[in-house]
Curated annotation (Swiss-Prot):
Protein name listed in UniProt: Xylosyltransferase 1
Compositionally biased intervals (Low complexity): 91-104
Similarity comment: family membership: Belongs to the glycosyltransferase 14 family. XylT subfamily.
Enzyme Commission code: 2.4.2.26
UniProt keyword list: Disulfide bond, Glycoprotein, Glycosyltransferase, Golgi apparatus, Membrane, Metal-binding, Signal-anchor, Transferase, Transmembrane, Transmembrane helix
Recorded catalytic activity of this chain's protein: UDP-alpha-D-xylose + L-seryl-[protein] = 3-O-(beta-D-xylosyl)-L-seryl-[protein] + UDP + H(+)
Subcellular location: Golgi apparatus membrane
Cellular component annotations (GO), alphabetically ordered: extracellular space; Golgi cis cisterna; Golgi membrane
Start-end of Basic and acidic residues biased regions: 134-150, 166-193
Length: 950
């Protein structure tokens, strides 16, 4: 009887204590809700997501501490994290309370999926994903490595790891500690994998035969396979035709072996490493044949009037064009500008560029002084194959006894002349005994270190593998700079046919060198009997912008960090008119980036085309051609090209309909025949799809071309906010972001469920501000949200949120908010696939690809609590429709795809490439937009009386 009142009092006290504890927790949450800021993606000063040359392929950084509440009542700005600026206004109190209730500090149990909501992950809160730190680079004259190379760690040799999940223990550690912890964790994972292959940072030696030692009875009982071993982490099985002849102990060689894909390449890596280790690969001493002390540097003068004093015996030039890609019309325009009947043109097309090779063969047949190499190499950036291409081209040219040339000039399709042929011939005739190469312009020891000349490289599997260190041979001076040069015939003969100690050993040394063409000819010339003929000028202007061009963009094909020139723009035109030093060519030019500058230069040299000439502001570039085969297309591209063709047929039926019946109705047949990008006035206008279709009126096959253009999807908030830096600018989403030219190389933004989209924002000038970016999927699931600091000088920012795949097909939205007030938004399409591995998709594949990520969780944390704040309700009907769509196949799937494509693309026009039964269908050659329409600026015709084409 006495115990009962005591128990009741205890319960009341416990209840009061519990309420007090909950109140304290609520207050702590109010104070502690901290949304982490995110550094600018690719701003002018703070720069992009991970250009940093020093970084490894790594998991996304761990979340930083949560940021402070943005949605406080109006008042003094709350201080934000180091990357954020300003506090601000927020949604109403009721919305704030809901948002707060949905984002507790600790993870909460997963809510069961109810009607109108999709199941989401339990961790409900906001975490930012910081991009990697940026390494700043500077101009270093003419060669392709960063100037501040002492600060660049090129040990980017670890096998790629899977994207890491949220790791709370890293959240409050500084970035350096996070990296250390992640590195230790990766090392522990590698050690824990059975028979795992050593990765980056390990010095474990492989015994001869390539088999790793194993512990315990497993090693004794396991069946042995000679010259075979498994690598960890899903790496390819390591096989050798012959066992390596030494212990492979260098970390670079071990890493190269773990990443090489083919058995042949791994064999070559092992053999090369062992030959070098045994002292059988590199020359130790080389003979110098130059009698001069130091470096010769002849001064040459440019005289604008020299063309008037043409010599009686003008030089004849062998132009060697080393080209790749698909920009055939730009190549033809450049060829047209440099052509003269007195010169010779030898064209090498990359082994992987079959479309361009077909186009080059076609126009080369028209001219007797144009030939195409009967052999082809894959000339990767920085690869030894480029030097091999030049040396073989030189040998071929010297063996062509009917081509009496005097100078060797190498060009690419991205070059363009900036002075006339007559001026070039007059200048070279005056200095016919000289060789023109651009040197690096700094001390050799520093150049050797920055250029990686003291490192051993091997090219195989279309990759340059770094295998270790080496010594520079004694007895010679090493030089280098630009790999664009003009060499006279005497020196070319010496390099090609000489068997002396210098040439023989330098060819061996540079066969295992990164960017060998940037140094081989310089070094041989400076140490040869021809050393007094060197002119430190390659007669070119190269558009170096180290801040943009040194993004380590070639790390996927070379174990080093390099730079690339930027494309010229109209504002650069004045640079071509300088006369301080002799220059005759400039690079780089890209018509898909800017064609106006090419037109300006062309008109400056050769005058304007006649008034009314068609196609001068248009540019077409092929991205698919039927002989390439559909295996050359991705499933996303093949899916959308088919949908674009059907969109064109529907336009023909609706807009070209005539009373006579079905004469303008078609049924699609087969795969697309070709696809072109179409630009007008340097603006992307969409795709041109050439495709086959059966005319239903006559049951005959016709070939048509459809023009589809993306609809405008970027819009400023209405009513406009007081935030003005996005006005007249843009927000875009895509893949293949080019940080150098600051555009998406995936023109049109064709995306599928397994793509990893990047968000890009272009800014106007203004004060430093912080904006919030929110990604919303087709059923209003908030997939990601993060802050970006836009500095006053920033023009672009970009970031790729680490979303779990697959993405849900449909129309996505990216919103930009300032102080949680909408500023702008854009939309992008994630297309459902109708093809998988270039075959019609199977029913068992559609649900895996079209139903979104597991439990609809795009990231570790959920942002479901922000839906009411942002007025983004999740509709049960919309969710159910998405579920049904995800299981669609056949005609139902095509109908779903076409409805999505029709909402984001417009069929602008359609034409017939040949005979047609549709009486109102226009012929493609009579349109201004078709890839079959006239293009005089790139068309090659008969040689004119003055010997030129232009």
């Amino acid at each position: 009887m006495v115990a009962a009142p005591s128990a009741r009092r205890l319960v009341r006290r416990s209840h009061s204590a519990l309420l007090a504890a909950l109140t304290v927790l609520l207050l702590q949450t109010l104070v502690g809700w901290n949304f982490s800021s995110l550094h600018s993606g690719a701003g002018e000063r703070r720069g992009g997501a991970a250009a940093g040359c020093t970084e490894q392929p790594a998991p996304p950084p761990a979340p930083a501490p949560r940021r402070e509440r943005r949605d406080l009542p109006p008042g003094p700005a709350a201080p934000l994290g180091a990357c954020c600026g300003g506090g601000g206004r927020g949604p109403p109190a009721r919305a704030r309370a809901r948002a707060l209730a949905g984002c507790p500090e600790e993870p909460r149990p997963q809510q069961p999926a109810g009607q109108g909501a999709l199941p989401t992950r339990a961790l409900d809160g906001y975490f930012s994903h910081r991009p990697k730190e940026k390494v700043r680079t500077d101009s270093n004259n003419e060669n392709s490595v960063p100037k501040d190379f002492e600060n660049v760690d090129n040990s980017n040799f670890a096998p790629r790891t899977q994207k890491q999940k949220h790791q709370p223990e890293l959240a409050k550690k500084p970035p350096s500690r996070q990296k250390e912890l992640l590195k230790r964790r990766l090392e522990q994972e590698e050690k824990g994998k059975g028979q795992s292959f050593p990765g980056k940072g390990t010095h474990e030696a492989l015994p001869p035969g390539g088999r790793a030692a194993v512990n315990g009875s497993h090693g004794k009982d396991a069946p042995r396979q000679p010259h075979t071993r498994k690598s960890g982490g899903g790496s390819p099985e390591l096989r050798y035709d012959q066992p390596p002849k030494c212990d492979i102990s260098g970390k670079e060689a071990i890493s190269a072996l773990s990443r090489a894909k083919s058995k042949h390449c791994r064999q070559e890596i092992g053999d090369t490493y062992c030959r070098h280790k045994l002292g059988m690969l590199m020359p130790k001493k080389v003979t110098r044949f130059c009698s001069l002390e130091g470096k010769a540097n002849k001064n040459v003068q440019w005289d604008e009037d020299s063309v008037e004093y043409m010599l009686a015996n003008p030089v004849r030039i062998a132009f060697v064009l080393v080209v790749h890609g698909r920009a055939s019309r730009q190549l033809q325009r450049m060829f047209k500008a440099i052509y003269h009947k007195d010169h010779f043109y030898y064209i090498h097309v990359d082994k992987r560029s079959n479309y361009l090779h077909r186009q080059v063969l076609q126009f080369a047949r028209q001219y007797g002084n144009v030939r195409v190499t009967p052999w082809r190499m894959a000339t990767i950036w920085g690869g030894a194959s480029l030097l091999s291409t030049y040396l073989q081209s030189m040998r071929d040219l010297l063996e062509m006894t009917d081509w009496p040339w005097d100078f060797f000039i190498n060009l690419s399709a991205a070059d363009y002349p900036i002075r006339t042929n007559d001026q070039l011939v007059a200048f070279l005739s005056r200095y016919r005994d000289m060789n023109f190469l651009k040197s690096h312009g700094r001390d050799n020891a520093r150049f050797i270190r920055k250029q990686g000349l003291d490192r051993l490289f091997l090219e195989c599997d279309a990759h340059m593998w770094r295998l270790g260190d080496r010594r520079i041979p004694e007895g010679i001076a090493v030089d280098g700079g630009s790999d664009w040069f003009l060499l006279n015939r005497k020196f070319v003969e010496y390099v090609t046919f000489s068997t002396d100690d210098l040439v023989t050993k330098m060819k061996q040394f540079y066969s295992y060198t990164l960017l060998p063409a940037e140094s081989f000819f310089h070094t041989v010339l400076e140490n040869s009997p021809h050393c007094d003929t060197m002119v430190d000028n390659n007669l070119r202007i190269t558009n170096w912008n180290r801040k943009l061009g040194c993004k380590c963009q070639y790390k996927h094909i070379v174990d080093w960090c390099g730079c690339s020139p930027n494309d010229f723009k109209p504002q650069d035109f004045h640079r071509f008119q300088q006369t301080a030093r002799p220059t005759f060519f400039a690079r780089k030019f890209e018509a898909v980036v800017n064609q106006e500058i090419i037109g300006q230069l062309d008109y400056y040299l050769y005058g304007n085309y006649p008034a009314g000439t068609p196609g001068l502001r248009s540019y077409w570039e092929n991205v698919y051609d039927e002989p390439d085969g559909i295996h050359s297309l991705s499933d996303v591209a093949l899916t959308l090209y088919h949908s674009f063709a059907r969109l064109g047929l529907r336009r023909a039926e609706s807009s070209l309909h005539v009373e006579t019946g079905n004469s303008c109705r078609y049924y699609p047949m087969g795969h697309p025949a070709s696809v072109h990008l179409y630009f007008l006035a340097d603006r992307f206008q969409g795709f041109l799809i050439k495709h086959h279709a059966t005319n239903l009126a006559v049951s005959k096959l016709e070939t048509l071309e459809t023009w589809v253009m993306p609809k405008k999807v970027f819009k400023i908030a209405s009513p406009p906010s007081d935030f003005g830096r996005l006005q007249f600018s843009e927000v875009r989403v895509g893949t293949d972001w080019d940080a150098k030219e600051r555009l998406f190389r995936n023109f049109g933004g064709l995306l599928g469920p397994m793509d990893e989209p990047v968000g890009m924002q272009k800014w106007g000038k203004g004060p430093n501000v912080t904006v919030t970016v929110i990604w919303v999927d087709p059923v209003n699931i908030i997939a990601a949200t993060y802050d970006i600091l836009i500095e006053s000088t920033a023009e672009f920012t970009h970031y790729k949120p680490p979303l779990n795949l697959p993405l849900r097909p449909g129309v996505w939205t990216v919103k930009i908010l300032h102080h949680w007030v909408p500023v702008a938004e854009t939309k992008f399409l994630v297309a459902p696939l109708t093809f998988s591995n270039r075959q019609p998709i199977k029913p068992e594949e559609v649900l895996k690809l079209h139903n979104g990520p597991l439990r609809s969780a795009y990231m570790e944390q959920s942002f479901q609590s922000l839906n009411p704040v942002l007025s983004l309700p999740i509709s049960p009907a919309q969710v159910e429709q998405a579920r049904r769509n995800a299981g669609s196949t056949g005609a139902t799937l095509e109908h779903w795809l076409d409805s999505l494509v029709g909402g984001t693309w417009t069929a602008m026009d359609i034409c017939a490439t040949g005979p047609t039964a549709c009486p109102v269908m226009q012929t493609c050659t009579h349109t201004a937009w078709s890839s079959f329409s006239p293009d005089p600026k790139s068309e090659l015709g008969a040689v004119k009386p003055d010997g030129r084409l232009r």
